[in-house]
């Protein structure tokens, strides 16, 4: 009895039995009688492990870690991330290793994991704790603490080597900070080490503070000395500068007095000019104010006149509108009456014009239809004549082609003799008969001159022999030629 088994996305099939030497791994397969199929999950599992180890000085410590471990599947390379693919033999070896890892997992762990889920956890914990303890026992606590990163990497490498024997692969490893073992009383190495570091930091801070305070006091004393030196120097320079400034002050005082007198004179002149300009400006302003007053009075008078004119205009406009309304109502009624009469007359004329136009349109359409029919008949007749001429031309063309073929065949039969071909065509065409007919019609009614000559005697003729008779006939023909030629020359107008 066969059945088809399919594994899930994260599952594999381990098939053993008939026809299989060892173990066959597949994602889907037919399972026949005599075979056994085991479906195992290849999903990685996270393990939180708290390893208790001891250094070479016999100091216990704890190493908390979190590992994500699972069976090693076939790894497909990504050219973008992993770079160019390795050679074919190397790639084959890698794939073989992955296949071997899955086979190891299927043989050693998969079945026991299904029966006892904690079996893999205990196995992994045992491997990690064993490798960590072996590595820690060969190092001092100081080496472990100072090289924590290196120690973690070595633990990871050693654990991975051990797990390779079981077909397991570490997907990720997060090793936490080293801590003291709480189960070992009196073991406070990392706490003491922290206190030591804290004390060292505090000592360095105090030394730095003392150095800063010392530098501050020295700087303050240096500042005080520099201040006294600078004060004495400034006093001496001040006395020299004071004497110099007194002499300069006297000179400047005399110069200032002269400048003050000049300035006062200039100011008096400026004041006089300003007063004169002020008087002129006051006179101009008085004039402008008086002119403005006069203009204001005149403007009031003009505005009163304009307002009075506007009032009179409004009154006249009101009277005009009143008269216009009275007269306009009568004119509007009369206008509307006349408009209605005109519209009625216009409507009658439009109806008559529409009727006339309709008759003309219908008459034009009838004439157009007659003209179209006549044109259609003419077109049909022309088409018939054109078709007859086309058929006649086609017949003539066919006759011409037939004649050409006949002439070509006759010329071929006559051996290329064009003279014989011409005579044959003239005979077939009745050219000679036509020439004889034309000559006969031309000679009808003509009275030719005929002369008959004979050489035969009465008695002697009967007694002549047959040969003599023939000679006499030939002589008669020769005697007749001159008159015949003369007659023909007179008829044909040809010189002979």
Swiss-Prot record:
State the GO CC annotations: caveola; plasma membrane; plasma membrane raft
Protein function: May act as a scaffolding protein within caveolar membranes, functionally participating in formation of caveolae or caveolae-like vesicles.
Which UniProt keywords are listed? Cell membrane, Coiled coil, Lipoprotein, Membrane, Palmitate
* Lipid group attachment sites (S-palmitoyl cysteine): 37
What is the topology of this protein in the membrane according to its UniProt annotation? Lipid-anchor
Q: What is this protein called?
A: Flotillin-like protein 3
Which positions, given as ranges, span the membrane? none
Q: Where is the signal peptide?
A: none
Record family assignment: Belongs to the band 7/mec-2 family. Flotillin subfamily.
Instruction: Please report the organism this UniProt entry assigns to the protein.
Output: Oryza sativa subsp. japonica (Rice)
**Residue ranges that the Swiss-Prot or TrEMBL entry lists as coiled coil:** 301-328
Organism classification: Eukaryota, Viridiplantae, Streptophyta, Embryophyta, Tracheophyta
